[in-house]
Amino acid sequence: MKLKFIALAISFILWGAHCSMGQNASYLGTKAPKGAKVYLDGTAKSLHKNWKYWEGPRFAAEMPIKWPQVVDPVDGGPVISSNDPAAAGGKYGAADIVTKDEFRDFEAHVEFFIKKEGGNSGVYLQNRYEIQILDGDYGTHGMAAVINEHLPSSKEYKGVGTWNAYDIQFRAARFEDGRLTEKARVTLFFNGVKIHDNVEIQQVWGGPNSGIDGGNDGGKGITDTPGGLKLQAEGHDVFYRNIWVRAVK
C-alpha cells in the first residue's frame, strides 16, 4: 500500500511539472524582436492606445472600447477579454477590434486563453483572412484553421484554461497595375509547431461583416489595400495578451 501511495504521489508531481512546463513553454511570453511593436501587453492602456473598433456594416458598439481588462487565471497579471456586450450571442462584426496600424507583409505573435468550453474568437490577417479560435471543433471552421480552406496539419491546442500561441508569417496578395497576380499566403506555428506551411488563401469568408473585401464579389474581390490585425468578439471570454507585429519589407 505504501509503495502504491508513493507511486501515486510521484505521478501527481510529474503531472504538475508537465502542466507547469506547458504554461512556461518557449512559445509563451515570446519577446518582440527588433523592429516589432507590442500592440497588446494585457493592459487596458495598451488596448486603447493601439486598437480601435472595426466599424463594419454590423458595428454596434460605442467608444471607448468595452473589452475589459481582467486578471490572468494562470499568472495573475492583466489580460484583455473579448467579451464585449455588443457582441453577445455571437454577433461577429459588432464589436471586433483592429490595430490602428495597417500592414501588408508581416510577422505576428498572439497569445490567447479560452475560459470555457465552446469559446469563440478569431485572428484576422489584414482584417481579411481569419485564423480561427474555437474550442471543441477541428474542422475547416475549427481551431487553428485558415477559415473554410485549410485544416491544421496537427492538433496542437492545449485546451480550455490554458494559454496558447499563434506565430504568424503573412505574405499579402500581389498586384500589378491594379490586377491581382498572387493570392495571400500564410505560415502558422501553433504552440511552437508548424501547422500551415505557406498555404494560399483564396478569399475572405463571412461576408461584409467579416472584414475588408468581405462584400466584394462574395469575398473573392481582393483589393490592394493594407489592413490591421483584427481580433473578433463573439460574446465569449477569450483572453489575449502579448500581441506584437513586425512589418516585413
Where does each model-flagged region fall?
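Bacterial N-terminal signal peptides that target proteins for export
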Residues: 1-7
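Carbohydrate-interacting regions of secretory-pathway proteins
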Residues: 19-249
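Bacterial N-terminal signal peptides
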Residues: 7-16
